[in-house]
Amino acid sequence: MGLELYMDLLSAPCRAVYIFARKNGIPFDFQFVDLLKGHHHSKEYIEINPLRKVPSLRDGKFILSESVAILCYLCRKYSAPSHWYPPDLHMRARVDEFMAWQHTAIQVPMSKILWIKLIIPMITGEEVPTERLDKTLDEVNKNIKQFEEKFLQDKLFITGDHISLADLVALVEMMQPMGTNHNVFISSKLAEWRMRVELAIGSGLFWEAHDRLVKLPSWDCSTLDPSIKMKICEFLQKYK
């Protein structure tokens, strides 16, 4: 049994793993876990990942969850070019620092924009209160500024002159609001960094990985599993 990656490219962490594997020529079987149909709650998937999250990796009998752990595993097993996860102590620590920070500072608020502006209204027919969206946008703007000042500074990439895992993870997370046509790349510094990362990845691969996200507004939500719709309606309650 070869390497299997369980993913849905609506998920930013899945896109990071997918792009990294494709960019580095790592052979894998794509096991599609449709989040919109609740496949991550299926008995079969829970046996692979009891946390019911994506992505997951299965390499023979070895199973791994969490995108950052998966990216580091792939780096080591397949001897990826060193710029992805630099061997230099300080540069690698900088990547680790960003990875630890981004979970709550970037991933969570970026996903909230997608949920609040698109997914919840689309599925439930109910709008999330405007003040909730405004609060999330304020958080995003604050954290984007911190990203620019703390991590990017005046460098081409987070660790210097070359793309790293930190840049890849940062960009796919910041793309999440694009599912609602919300652009967070307002400043010239951030927009220029975004384009450098896209070009380093390859524009074809980059947009292939984001195709499912940008097409989300045209998704027919009548195909949604009723049990999943119920879970989302329950999820909405905390935004009221």
Swiss-Prot record:
Q: What is this protein called?
A: Glutathione S-transferase theta-4
What's the encoding gene here?
Gstt4
Q: Where in the cell is it found?
A: Cytoplasm
Record keyword Transmembrane present: no
Cite the record's note on assembly: Homodimer.
Residue ranges of domain GST C-terminal in the record: 88-218
Q: Which Gene3D superfamilies match?
A: 1.20.1050.10, Glutaredoxin (3.40.30.10)
Question: What's the EC number here?
Answer: 2.5.1.18
